[in-house]
Amino acid sequence: MRTDWNFFFCILLQAIFVVGTQTSRTLVLYDQSTEPLEEYSVYLKDLEQRNYKLEYLDINSTSTTVDLYDKEQRLFDNIIVFPTKGGKNLARQIPVKQLIKFFENEGNILCMSSPGAVPNTIRLFLNELGIYPSPKGHVIRDYFSPSSEELVVSSNHLLNKYVYNARKSEDFVFGESSAALLENREQIVPILNAPRTSFTESKGKCNSWTSGSQGFLVVGFQNLNNARLVWIGSSDFLKNKNQDSNQEFAKELLKWTFNEKSVIKSVHAVHSHADGTSYDEEPYKIKDKVIYSVGFSEWNGEEWLPHIADDIQFELRQVDPYYRLTLSPSGNDSETQYYTTGEFILPDRHGVFTFLTDYRKIGLSFTTDKDVKAIRHLANDEYPRSWEISNSWVYISAICGVIVAWIFFVVSFVTTSSVGKKLETFKKTN
């Protein structure tokens, strides 16, 4: 008995140890000669307090390649890249292909640049995603800015409420900043665009990279695996000296980057006959009445809450969607909001169909729920009889009319008496 209790106690301690040691491993790459790490201590300490295990690496301290993998296992969950002028060192330590592989394998990346520090490794990596930061030496200017010494941007230029939803008017200090042009991709998440009166100019040259609100100061990207990237065009944005104006936005931005918020999941996706009979009990056939329902929850950084939306759609597809129906709320509990299609009729076509909910909203994590089921055709004894088809009534009436007429003719022919007539005979004489 004592042995059993000891075994149970060891298992309990091991479980507590595993839960307690689940930290988010983060690699911090910086250039001490360009941007001293002490200037970002407020946000780095905040990450450590939120159970992030930070590993720091000065790119000038080594020229060897940084190991992001142990065989096929990721060694880090996140990477933070501060502005660096040692572009060649960064390229040797983390090549572009390695960054792409890390991002494809669900690793999150936060990178910053400045007009004087735009490493080619980061630039080429961002270009692969459709984000084009301004070249080195290009600075965004706004002569209508409240400050003549640094760029100040209003919260009115925020573009995505799932990243940061300002409850009141705020001003964000960027100092000297770069701006980026964006491709038209659904994975790109525009977060903060430049003021309409701004433009990007090169020092000593008259050419411009962006003009007005076509430039972006903060940009996100979320791949299909829900790994996230954020690029910030200014090295001053996260500095301690600007935390009074930028703190709330910066904290929420870091939470979004590292999947601490705006993460949704789909649960309890079910479909059945309209009377509640499941597919296993009675497989679907064409023109059956069916109901589909699914639930959605959203992680707010502390707990799962019901996700409220009015644009979630259900698709019944074979190759292309046969139906695309907007889901309606049907109920909720403390964690989940449930949605349903209501009753709908399956198409008059048999085959293999996918019951699909693919919800992709910019700023929220992507979630897909699909179930593949076969829809059979009607059996021989399940087709409607001819008299049930209204279009056949004309032909049935014609057939019945012919039969009745024939019977009437036969009866009349048989029962009607014939009149006898005597024939005269003559003998032929020569």
From Swiss-Prot:
Keywords: Endoplasmic reticulum, Glycoprotein, Membrane, Signal, Transmembrane, Transmembrane helix. It is found in: Endoplasmic reticulum membrane. It is a single-pass type I membrane protein. GO terms for molecular function: glycosyltransferase activity. Residues 24-393 are lumenal. GO terms for biological process: protein N-linked glycosylation; protein N-linked glycosylation via asparagine. InterPro entries: DDOST_48_kDa_subunit, OST48_MD, OST48_N. The cytoplasmic C-terminal domain contains a functional dilysine-retrieval motif, which is involved in the retrograde Golgi-to-ER transport of the protein. Subunit of the oligosaccharyl transferase (OST) complex that catalyzes the initial transfer of a defined glycan (Glc(3)Man(9)GlcNAc(2) in eukaryotes) from the lipid carrier dolichol-pyrophosphate to an asparagine residue within an Asn-X-Ser/Thr consensus motif in nascent polypeptide chains, the first step in protein N-glycosylation. N-glycosylation occurs cotranslationally and the complex associates with the Sec61 complex at the channel-forming translocon complex that mediates protein translocation across the endoplasmic reticulum (ER). All subunits are required for a maximal enzyme activity. Belongs to the DDOST 48 kDa subunit family. This is Dolichyl-diphosphooligosaccharide--protein glycosyltransferase subunit WBP1.
